[in-house]
Regions:
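Short S/T/G/P-rich N-terminal loop/turn motif that feeds into the first structured element of a domain
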Residues: 1-62, 70-80, 96, 103-105
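Short, flexible helix/strand-to-coil boundary loops that buttress conserved ligand/catalytic motifs
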Residues: 79, 88-91
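Short glycine/proline-enriched turn or capping motifs at secondary-structure junctions
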Residues: 91-98
């Protein structure tokens, strides 16, 4: 599938997190702080957003991370970063299960 107008496809990364407790305003605010730091540190990030899962089929997966990168190499650099390690360590005690999907579109 090609993007509209023949532009280059982006690399999209989506994480669904099951949490021990539903995401509250304090958690979402802290995750927005991380989001802003990622956007500032990585110019190849086109979108980066945590949010409560609004799907009626969310089930136990109450938190979503949606991100889009210029390409897969940019995504790999993000995953290898100390900032990624920091957010992963922050979320680790809160998360009971994670599902991840990546596509280029």
């Amino acid at each position: 599938v090609s993007p509209p107008g023949g532009s280059r496809p982006l690399f999209h990364h989506c994480c669904l997190f099951a949490l021990a407790a539903p995401p509250d305003a304090a958690l979402l605010a802290e995750l927005e702080r991380f989001s802003a730091a990622f956007r500032a540190a990585f110019p190849a990030i086109r979108r980066y957003r945590f949010g409560a899962n609004l799907s009626r089929k969310a089930g136990r997966f109450g938190l979503v991370l949606y991100s889009a990168f210029d390409d897969e190499a940019s995504f790999r650099a993000y995953v290898a970063s100390a900032l990624h390690d920091e957010v992963a360590a922050f979320l680790a005690p809160l998360v009971t299960e994670t599902m991840i999907g990546d596509i280029e579109a």
